[in-house]
Amino acid sequence: MARKKLAKLILMTLGILMWGMVSSRAATAASGTLYVVSTGPGDPQHITVKALETIKKADLVLCSSESAKHLQEILKGKKVEDPWKELWWHQGKVWMKDLATFKPEERAKIVAEKKRQRDEYVKRLKTLLAQGKNIALLDRGDPTVYSRSFWLLEGLDPDQVEIIPGMGAMTAAMAALKKCSTGAGARFVAQTAPFGFFGKTDREDLARDLSHYPGTLVFYMGLTEIDNLVNTLQKYNPADLPVAVVYYAGYDDKEKIVKGNLGNILDQLASEKEKFMGIIIVGQCLEGPTFTLGEETKEKPAISKGPDQGK
């Protein structure tokens, strides 16, 4: 009798364990995924097949109203929502970008409020994911470079997120220029922006240090700081170092290239009105040979020695 009771107890225990495992797997299988989807730079034709397939299976698409209009044919019939209208703007400004323009006490309030709004929004996304819903968060260009999407994802478990890569603005810009960013003996390619390039205590540290080596500098969101960028680079590099600005990279009807060098690029850009949609490229790759075949580039290095070198 005791053996029968023990056997029955063991069977019940095994049954409970198996039920728990099946339930756990079922719950995991039912969980949705949030996809950060690159839609490429410029025209919709740059979007990848995988991105299209991901959008197709999404129950909810998150993107700016501008992107929704730009991709209206692709998003036809989808439920679309703009998360950035509330999360990204404050008094008509992009709060994270213009945070330094606010007084310290107001700055702290803005950060706290935006984090609260973000956390509330993420809480809602978690609920949808738990219900098995798939969400596509669209990102123009390369979603892994200066992407606001990652700020929104901070409250999510990495296992709930998948990144669908795609073409970035730098690739589109170099394609427009018909140049290779690693050409002319470049030892590095740096993707940066003014708020990262200019240090807080020593604003010229990178400009000074990188001028020791041949390389290519690619600046995002740099048009509003183009004067500071050029003037700083001029201190450590020769005036004939090539510079190019590609406006609206990837847009067939808007793409425009302005070429020059550190000595004349500001004059070349004086009549241009666009102050955001442009990629700035600096380096000998714009004019030098793609392959140096091991030859030294001492006569004209990509980022060469300037008058204030070593100070």
Segment roles from a protein language model:
Residues 26-45, 49-164:
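Class I S-adenosyl-L-methionine
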Residues 10-21:
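Bacterial N-terminal signal peptides
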Residues 29-36, 106-114, 130-135, 148, ...:
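A contiguous loop/helix-start segment that scaffolds small-molecule binding in enzyme catalytic cores
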Residues 1-11:
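Bacterial N-terminal signal peptides that target proteins for export
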